[in-house]
Amino acid sequence: MKVWMAILISILCWQSSVWAVCPAWSPARAQEEISRLQQQIKQWDDDYWKEGKSEVEDGVYDQLSARLTQWQRCFGSEPRDVMMPPLNGAVMHPVAHTGVRKMVDKNALSLWMRERSDLWVQPKVDGVAVTLVYRDGKLNKAISRGNGLKGEDWTQKVSLISAVPQTVSGPLANSTLQGEIFLQREGHIQQQMGGINARAKVAGLMMRQGNSDTLNSLAVFVWAWPDGPQLMTDRLKELATAGFTLTQRYTRAVKNADEIARVRNEWWKAKLPFVTDGVVVRAAKEPESRHWLPGQAEWLVAWKYQPVAQVAEVKAIQFAVGKSGKISVVASLAPVMLDDKKVQRVNIGSVRRWQEWDIAPGDQILVSLAGQGIPRIDDVVWRGAERTKPTPPENRFNSLTCYFASDVCQEQFISRLVWLGSKQVLGLDGIGEAGWRALHQTHRFEHIFSWLLLTPEQLQNTPGIAKSKSAQLWHQFNLARKQPFTRWVMAMGIPLTRAALNASDERSWSQLLFSTEQFWQRLPGTGSGRARQVIEWKENAQIKKLGSWLAAQQITGFEP
């Protein structure tokens, strides 16, 4: 009873999560959006099944198909059958292909396993499903999966694949096998290489005419022997003897979900001879094949890998002004998970880059993780029917603006605070962008160093700053007063690298103000252009005012 209650709760939670992300569209808008995406997916289906080609990555197709189903459920439409091929000239399967139900996570897998025993795990090989029929020891028929009941006659094509045994003996002499035709790979590491659109490539080779030589790049992984030996070990041994060696090599007995998770992770990182998109867990005990029906297999489930890239909906476009005055564009996203990381924002880049991408709220973009886990945009995979893009702010900012606070300077001013508090500058631990915004909103800073005047009481009474952290923050602000002169000059935004500034041997504000352009130009990595920028910087009225203010605060190097 507890098991079924847990399953019911999981279903309700899943339904709630689906409904929680339903778009706020009018019925007319919903009909238009659903119709447009439906037509596009139908076109991709036609290309895939009739022409053997694919204009879209497998992962993108799968996720957009899921998005369409979600929209249809949200607005009361009938969900479509995913990847339903045409039935022209179809051949009946001796045993139906059941398909496999997907588990959302390890907890769901554990629930499914509780009432089952003698379980085995296999890689979920990424290719196209096929039925192999052997009669009197010879390959008699090969049938594509189709709709699970009927498929295309692929006998001629499969007979040209050298990796598929054309003759068998013993228990397999009169047998029906189900498996996956896949693209042979040498040392494919799924974690690093991804799916490489393997499914579409295999489908293309099987659908095209006159490509007998290229068919030898294919092989088959048998994952089911309906009405075969009762013991899995016997099945695997007979299949290996007949030439289906991969099945025995990549089928392991498992006892619990933790063990499956370890194998799943191992295969994700290992060099394999095929592309995979997860694992399949199956019970050795199966019903008689006459009871097999599409969508009704209770003896096996799949646990797919988290996609390397996720399709995410753009919720908003936001503009940020950095400390140098450059405007950058950020896309706010409906949350997606990438490698256990929740991604809600992605940096697009400059305004020009954003305009080149042509991204608007409501669009669907493909997001992955670049180096150090930073989200990046790979592609715009779908644009909404109604698109309204915000107007970027005027480009009135530069490297010498917004040292002092004003309404128009809000974003660049905050960026300057974040910069000066970073580890490489003043090293103010425990405060980031949100903390600076809270302090500025409450205490209305005059300039970027106004925080030096805050008292412990003011910090303690700042909304958004935890009282337990206020004392620590005040301590950090006081410690900053003892930072070296060069750190304070960096906080003021001098256009030099730290190495060049240290090489200058400048140790006082008055000395720095009297240094000539020729002096700066002789520093390592500092040409004439950079030297002129330093002169412009130190002669700026805001910079001079800040220098005088720091002198009044008796900051090292600024004293008269």
Curated annotation (Swiss-Prot):
Disulfide feature: none
InterPro entries membership: DNA_ligase_AS, DNA_ligase_B, DNA_ligase_CS, DNAligase_adenylation, DNAligase_N, NA-bd_OB-fold, NAD_dep_DNA_ligaseB, NAD_DNA_ligase_OB
The UniProt record lists the keyword DNA damage: yes
GO BP terms, alphabetized: DNA repair; DNA replication
Keyword presence, Secreted: no
Organism superkingdom: Bacteria
Active-site residues annotated for this sequence: K124
Keywords from the UniProt entry: DNA damage, DNA repair, DNA replication, Ligase, NAD
GO terms, molecular function: DNA ligase (NAD+) activity
Pfam families (UniProt xref): DNA_ligase_aden, DNA_ligase_OB
UniProt catalytic activity: NAD(+) + (deoxyribonucleotide)n-3'-hydroxyl + 5'-phospho-(deoxyribonucleotide)m = (deoxyribonucleotide)n+m + AMP + beta-nicotinamide D-nucleotide
Enzyme Commission (EC) number: 6.5.1.2
NCBIfam families reported for this sequence: PRK08097.1 (NF005987)
Job of this protein: Catalyzes the formation of phosphodiester linkages between 5'-phosphoryl and 3'-hydroxyl groups in double-stranded DNA using NAD as a coenzyme and as the energy source for the reaction.
Annotated family: Belongs to the NAD-dependent DNA ligase family. LigB subfamily.
Protein name: DNA ligase B
Organism: Shigella sonnei (strain Ss046)
Underlying gene: ligB
